[in-house]
């Protein structure tokens, strides 16, 4: 049986629980490579228009081409050709044929870059780092394979030089493919 006291108790305002005090965030002074990467990312965000494109693509012919080229590239470089290098080659060729996409901003000017320098996002312990494959449009698949594998290894070992992280005109990632 429900009595008047039960109804009144139910209707009484509920007191809010105490809000915990905000914790002060930890601040870590950046230096060295981490600072250089942050500076490059900030400059990139300010000067290069950002566009993200995700597409479904039938890669059947690319898979077949890679299978045929694997032994050739590996015998020339000592590295296995991955889809990353094929994507870099395709993007570099496209940017060369569409130079207005290979552009950046400098103040009130649009800069059409003559070099096609592809930034490759590489997962490292503390996040991502983006080494730059210089003049990717002038490299064949074997040279792109050697360059990207070397830069990726140096990135994971924290041995990239600042110049190896500068100058990208376009950045890609294949999301772990």
Residues covered by each model-derived region:
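C-terminal catalytic/motor cores of large multi-domain enzyme assemblies
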Residues: 1-177
